[in-house]
């Protein structure tokens, strides 16, 4: 929300998924970027302990993903670009979330985002964890802040599973190649956003300034492209990420 408040104006939040409830870990609403109407999606981790618990430490429930998708379809109906901000360790894996269809909600977002007929941009501002992050990041442009990370599992979780030793988190992080430069080299993101010295958390205004410039540049490029080409290239990009090769 720090970025939304500093980069956009006239943010008007939309609540609820019209099916179960309103997930406070996910915020969606219409806003203006340099006067242009856009849909903004962001997740909230909370500040105080009480606030973090209320927002589930930033981990969305199914209703959070469904709320985001409902808003994306509204944006598509009115021809508004979609910009999402992601900083979450993953989707919430609790029993209630599974009973309400967490896997289906994530899969549905992946499908629908891949064919949205509006320009889409996703920004990973801190941590982008697994399918929970990808469910908000199937976009024409995926940006990654210079000090952010993008992974299929946290290094601690990987170390615990692979070696049964969470203290080997640095070994896991190195093997997983989760830094901005490494993720970009793998073709998983389209651009790295420069941060102020010490990181954006030390100077939110400067960090928002850097990111705002990038958003305007990429949005202008996307809006100059034919819609059929946008959708085709978006789908091709994510299919190519999934390709791998082996040597016999």
Range-by-range predicted roles:
Residues 1-160, 164-167, 174-248:
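Terminal-region recognition feature
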């Amino acid at each position: 929300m720090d970025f939304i408040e500093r980069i956009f104006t006239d943010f008007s939040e939309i609540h609820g998924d019209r099916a179960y409830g309103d997930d406070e870990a996910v915020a969606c609403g219409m806003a203006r970027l340099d006067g242009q109407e856009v849909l903004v999606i962001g997740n909230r981790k909370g500040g105080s302990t009480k606030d973090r618990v209320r927002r589930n430490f930033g981990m969305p429930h199914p209703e959070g993903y469904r709320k985001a998708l409902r808003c994306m379809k509204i944006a598509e109906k009115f021809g508004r670009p979609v910009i999402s901000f992601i900083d979450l360790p993953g989707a919430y894996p609790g029993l209630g979330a599974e009973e309400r269809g967490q896997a289906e909600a994530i899969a549905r977002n992946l499908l629908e985002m891949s064919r949205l007929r509006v320009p889409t941009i996703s920004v990973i501002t801190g941590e982008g964890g697994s399918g929970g992050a990808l469910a908000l990041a199937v976009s024409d442009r995926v940006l990654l802040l210079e000090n952010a990370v993008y992974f299929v599992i946290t290094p601690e979780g990987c170390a615990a599973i692979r070696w049964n030793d969470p203290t080997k988190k640095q070994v896991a992080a190195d093997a997983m190649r989760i830094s901005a430069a490494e993720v970009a080299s793998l073709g998983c993101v389209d651009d790295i956003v420069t941060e102020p010295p010490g990181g954006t958390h030390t100077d939110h205004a400067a960090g928002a300034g850097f990111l705002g410039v990038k958003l305007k540049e990429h949005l202008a490029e996307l809006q100059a492209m034919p819609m059929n080409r946008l959708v085709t290239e978006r789908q091709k990009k994510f299919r190519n990420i999934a390709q791998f090769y082996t040597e016999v």
